[in-house]
């Protein structure tokens, strides 16, 4: 799945769209996504000047976005009408730093899959080595229901 299809599914945009490509998807079971970590990411202006490290929370967000694609595709939710929102994170661990130039591979496996609440085990890797892992919980919500009324 290329970036155009990803942008049709996810409401995220620059600078927080953190998925560049979906390499594999097995609806209802698992997904593998890719994030190219560029030195041009705005976060590196402050994290950290002179020794840029990709923040752990960005790795978790990238995992969540990949998991959101799996939820939307697996549950046959209407594209452009739903967003997947965080419901919880358990057992998050950061094993190694992620640097500009790294290619982050994001692997998620379904533990339970429901519109109201899904749970997935996520692993992030660089060069085949685990850099982070977590269990993520998320819920699918209609965009019209989560937009703040001004």
UniProtKB/Swiss-Prot annotation:
Q: Name one GO biological process term.
A: fatty acid biosynthetic process
Indicate where this protein is primarily found. Answer: cytoplasm
Which branch of life, at top level?
Answer: Bacteria
User: What Pfam families has UniProt attached to this entry?
Assistant: FabA
| Keyword Membrane applies | no
Q: What is its EC number?
A: 4.2.1.59
Indicate the family of this protein: Belongs to the thioester dehydratase family. FabZ subfamily.
Chain's role: Involved in unsaturated fatty acids biosynthesis. Catalyzes the dehydration of short chain beta-hydroxyacyl-ACPs and long chain saturated and unsaturated beta-hydroxyacyl-ACPs.
What HAMAP family does UniProt report for this protein, alphabetically? FabZ
What is the protein name stated in its UniProt record?
Answer: 3-hydroxyacyl-[acyl-carrier-protein] dehydratase FabZ
Source organism of the structure: Aquifex aeolicus (strain VF5)
Taxonomic lineage per UniProt? Bacteria, Pseudomonadati, Aquificota, Aquificia, Aquificales
Q: Gene name, please?
A: fabZ
């Amino acid at each position: 799945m290329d970036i155009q299809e990803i942008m049709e599914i996810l409401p995220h945009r620059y600078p927080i769209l953190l998925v560049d490509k979906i390499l594999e998807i097995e609806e209802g079971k698992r997904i593998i996504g890719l994030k190219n970590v560029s030195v041009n990411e705005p976060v590196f202006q402050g994290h950290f000047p002179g020794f840029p490290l990709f923040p752990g929370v960005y790795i978790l967000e990238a995992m969540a976005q990949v998991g959101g694609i799996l939820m939307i595709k697996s549950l046959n939710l209407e594209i452009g009408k739903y967003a997947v929102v965080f419901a919880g994170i358990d057992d998050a661990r950061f094993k190694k730093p992620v640097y500009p130039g790294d290619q982050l591979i994001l692997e998620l496996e379904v533990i339970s899959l429901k519109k109201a609440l899904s749970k997935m085990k996520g692993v992030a890797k660089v060069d085949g080595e685990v850099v982070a892992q977590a269990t993520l919980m998320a819920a699918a919500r209609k965009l019209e229901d989560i937009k703040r009324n001004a």
